[in-house]
Amino acid sequence: MDKRHDPSRRIIAPTGTKLSCKSWLTEAPMRMLMNNLHPDVAERPEDLVVYGGIGRAARDWECYDKIVEVLQRLEDDETLLVQSGKPVGVFKTHSNAPRVIIANSNLVPHWANWEHFNELDKKGLAMYGQMTAGSWIYIGSQGIVQGTYETFVAMAKQHFGGSSKGKWILTGGLGGMGGAQPLAGTMAGYSVLTCEVDETRIDFRLRTRYVDKKATTLDEALAMIDEANASGKPVSVGLLANAADVFAELVERGITPDVVTDQTSAHDPLNGYLPQGWTLEQAAQMRKTDEAAVVKAAKQSMAVQVKAMLALQAAGSATTDYGNNIRQMAFEEGVENAFDFPGFVPAYVRPLFCEGIGPFRWAALSGDPEDIYKTDAKVKELIPDNPHLHNWLDMARERIAFQGLPSRICWVGLKDRARLALAFNEMVNNGELSAPVVIGRDHLDSGSVASPNRETESMLDGSDAVSDWPLMNALLNTASGATWVSLHHGGGVGMGFSQHSGVVIVADGTDDAAARLGRVLWNDPATGVMRHADAGYDIAKDCAKEQGLDLPMLEK
């Protein structure tokens, strides 16, 4: 019997102001853990899988129950340690220490590969935490919508003279991360064709308004795209098909999309990518009987897809890797020029990282959408001169369906995170908000990740693989008083290819919270500016000087 599987479980986080724990500092991690497993949030909540192949919130159901039990009894001078989804210890600390410290799927580098991890996973000794699955701050597909939107807007500026009118995107994957692409694309003015092998995922994205239409043949999907481009009204289409088949077929037909990318779970060839010609049922069975054959077949199909992406790039498509390590998988299968198209971070996002700008997010523990709308208004009030940001907030309110607890993603940087957080804390204090909010971010941020095939690809000084930075980020956030801090391995791109840290802090309206918020939400993005300044980026050096960062080796 698999201790991770229980179809009878239906987890819904409590809402309102009644506490199940001894304070908001422990109530918040409990609610956010539960929210990660909400049926509208998680991909396979009955298996504790939140997103990204096998990204879990807890190691098994026994561990989940024990985490909740401990959080409900935890005092405000105690810290719970969670090791790969298992609560292993409670220790006396102090009131400004984190209430929870999490480490997920970390392996000594020589053994940091899927084969070793999968053996540990089978024995119940490890858990893959992805990025925000095991750190309890996943907010559904909204969590990546704005970053994807910003990337697509940047692509329009770089490749199409600033206009996406009549342009269309080809991509793959409608899981927890990939599901953001169709909505982000149409928000940015493109039509989007997304290939997905699991019809239930297409239906889920239709229900939550991330996808506009479903197609079962390529001809049907292309007709929908053509009609939308002719009418000037962008459309997103979920096509029930294997991405490798479709990408290769478009090359064969001589059809060239304007933008090509992919967000299948290629980072995990065993669990995340369906080989060409296989059914979902066949793959599920083969994973039990012949893992090596599944991995081999999946990587061969990825090689087909990447070859097609390279061919489409040569035909004129703006082509980018959206951070799932598909280029690496294809390279290992003999596609020697797999890295001829760039990753999205060095191509489009790094200038933002240089100013500490990244995926700042918050969730309303009240469960009341009005609390989010009030914070949206506060962001506009405090950042009045950023029409692009205002436009994002307006579109998000109009077009993004909340999944689980109401939440918002908003890319802001060093200059703004702490002051927004302090304003939210004051809104809790004066009763404008009906309950506290939690403030966190993705691990995909400027100072919190080392990932040579994604966030730290092609660093100016060649320091792509140096992972001191996310370790220092986690330690500094712990010292600064975050409510929970996490340190993970393998998120986004798979085992052996990344290390990264997460941070979440509660704004409960108290003066103590204000002090912690001021420290954490200044120091956290400041580490991103520091990391990029150290690598030699002028934008980061200028930002560090403007903001008065004390970086001893930076020339004054």
Curated annotation (Swiss-Prot):
NAD(+) binds at residues 52-53, 130, 176-178, 196, 201, 242-243, 263-267, 273-274, 322, 492. It catalyses: 4-imidazolone-5-propanoate = trans-urocanate + H2O. Binds 1 NAD(+) per subunit. It comes from the Bacteria. One of its GO terms (biological process) is L-histidine catabolic process to glutamate and formate. Its EC number is 4.2.1.49. The active site is at C410. Belongs to the urocanase family. It comes from Shewanella piezotolerans (strain WP3 / JCM 13877). Pathway: Amino-acid degradation; L-histidine degradation into L-glutamate; N-formimidoyl-L-glutamate from L-histidine: step 2/3. Its main location: cytoplasm. One of its GO terms (molecular function) is urocanate hydratase activity. This is Urocanate hydratase. It is found in: Cytoplasm. The lineage of its organism: Bacteria, Pseudomonadati, Pseudomonadota, Gammaproteobacteria, Alteromonadales. GO terms for cellular component: cytoplasm. The keyword Cell division does not apply. SUPFAM superfamilies: Urocanase (SSF111326).
